[in-house]
C-alpha cells in the first residue's frame, strides 16, 4: 500500500528511527504502525548484533544514591560525541535508578533487571545500540548498602568520566567525606591499604625494581645488604602511591589519608572508583583504513 508522510512522521516519533527506515517498515507491514514498530525492532536488533564486536571505550561513569543504597556504574559508547548526548545521559540515569531499586550483585543479574518499559536493561541497551548507531553497553556497576551509623558519599567529576563512591564505618562530616571522594578521584588509588595489595603484584613490582637497579649506575657496587634495603624502600614508595591510606591527603598534606581517617575516628569500608575506558584497549585506525572498512574493502 502507499505510505503517506503522516504515518512516517508518527512512526518516527514513536521509535526515533530514521525516516527511510520508517518508510521501509511501513511498506513491509502494509502501513500497520504496530507491526512496523516490531519490524524496526527486529531489524534494529540485527543491526545492533553486527556492532557487538566493536570496541566501546568512551562513555559515562555515574555515582548516584537514594535513601538505602549508592550505585556506581559505567556505561560505554564508541565515541565521546555520543557520550555527551542528552538521550545517552538520560539512559544512564534510568539504568542507575533500576539498579538502585534492586539487589543485583553481578553484571548478568543487572542486565536482566526490568526497566519501566518492561524491557530488561540488556534489551534497552541493544535497542539503544540500534537507534544510536554505536555499541552501547553496561560495563560494570557496584551497589553499596547504607547502614545506620555509617557515612556514604559520592563524587562525579564534571567531565562525567570519573566517579567515586565511598562508605565509612562511623560518622564523618559531609564536607570531609566529599573531599576524600575528590582525593580518590584525583589520585586514583588502586587499593585501600598496602595490606590489600596481592602478593603477586608486589613480587612483580619488586622484580621490575631489581631490573631497573641493574641499569642505575648510582647503585652499582653497593654492598648486597645495602642494595636490598634500597630496593625495599623503592618498593614501599611505589606501593604507597597506589594505597589510599598511605597517600598524602591532597586537601591537607600534613596528613596521610590514613592519619586523617584516624583523627576523625572512622574506618573506610568500601572504595569504588570508576574511570571510563580504563583497561579497555582502544582500536586506532587511520582515515584511509576507516573509509576502506566502510566501503567493504
Curated annotation (Swiss-Prot):
Compartments reported by the entry: Cytoplasm
Molecular function in Gene Ontology: translation elongation factor activity
Pfam families referenced in this protein's UniProt entry, alphabetically: EF_TS (PF00889)
Subcellular location, principal: cytoplasm
Metal-binding listed as a keyword: no
Highest taxon, organism lineage: Bacteria
GO cellular component: cytoplasm
Protein keywords: Cytoplasm, Elongation factor, Protein biosynthesis
Record-linked HAMAP family: EF_Ts
PANTHER family, per database record: ELONGATION FACTOR TS (PTHR11741), ELONGATION FACTOR TS, MITOCHONDRIAL (PTHR11741:SF0)
Functional summary from the UniProt entry: Associates with the EF-Tu.GDP complex and induces the exchange of GDP to GTP. It remains bound to the aminoacyl-tRNA.EF-Tu.GTP complex up to the GTP hydrolysis stage on the ribosome.
The protein's name: Elongation factor Ts
Species the sequence originates in: Mesoplasma florum (strain ATCC 33453 / NBRC 100688 / NCTC 11704 / L1)
Gene name tied to this protein: tsf
Amino acid at each position: 500500500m502507499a505510505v503517506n508522510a503522516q504515518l512516517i512522521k508518527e512512526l518516527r516519533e514513536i521509535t526515533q528511527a530514521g525516516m527511510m527506515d520508517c518508510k521501509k517498515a511501513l511498506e513491509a507491514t502494509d502501513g500497520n504502525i504496530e507491526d512496523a514498530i516490531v519490524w524496526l525492532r527486529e531489524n534494529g536488533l540485527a543491526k545492533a548484533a553486527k556492532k557487538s564486536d566493536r570496541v566501546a571505550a568512551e562513555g559515562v561513569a555515574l555515582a548516584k544514591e537514594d535513601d538505602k543504597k549508592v550505585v556506581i556504574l559505567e556505561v560505554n559508547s564508541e565515541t565521546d560525541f555520543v557520550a555527551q548526548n542528552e538521550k545517552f545521559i538520560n539512559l544512564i540515569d534510568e539504568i542507575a535508578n533500576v539498579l538502585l531499586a534492586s539487589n543485583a550483585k553481578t553484571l548478568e543479574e543487572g542486565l536482566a533487571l526490568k526497566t519501566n518499559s518492561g524491557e530488561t536493561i540488556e534489551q534497552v541497551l541493544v535497542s539503544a545500540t540500534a537507534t544510536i548507531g554505536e555499541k552501547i553497553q553496561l560495563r560494570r556497576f557496584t551497589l553499596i548498602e547504607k547502614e545506620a551509623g555509617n557515612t556514604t558519599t559520592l563524587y562525579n567529576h564534571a567531565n562525567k568520566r570519573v566517579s567515586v563512591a565511598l562508605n565509612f564505618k562511623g560518622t564523618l562530616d559531609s564536607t570531609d567525606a566529599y573531599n576524600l571522594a575528590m582525593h580518590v578521584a584525583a589520585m586514583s588509588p588502586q587499593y585501600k591499604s598496602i595490606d590489600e595489595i596481592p602478593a603477586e603484584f608486589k613480587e612483580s613490582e619488586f622484580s621490575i625494581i631489581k631490573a631497573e637497579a641493574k641499569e642505575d649506575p648510582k647503585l652499582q657496587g653497593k654492598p648486597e645488604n645495602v642494595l636490598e634495603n634500597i630496593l625495599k624502600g623503592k618498593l614501599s614508595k611505589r606501593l604507597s602511591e597506589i594505597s589510599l591510606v598511605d597517600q598524602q591527603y591532597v586537601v591537607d598534606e600534613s596528613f596521610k589519608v590514613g592519619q586523617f581517617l584516624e583523627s576523625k575516628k572512622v574506618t573506610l569500608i568500601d572504595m569504588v572508583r570508576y574511570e571510563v575506558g580504563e583497561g579497555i584497549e582502544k582500536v586506532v585506525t587511520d582515515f584511509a583504513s576507516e573509509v576502506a572498512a566502510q566501503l567493504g574493502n
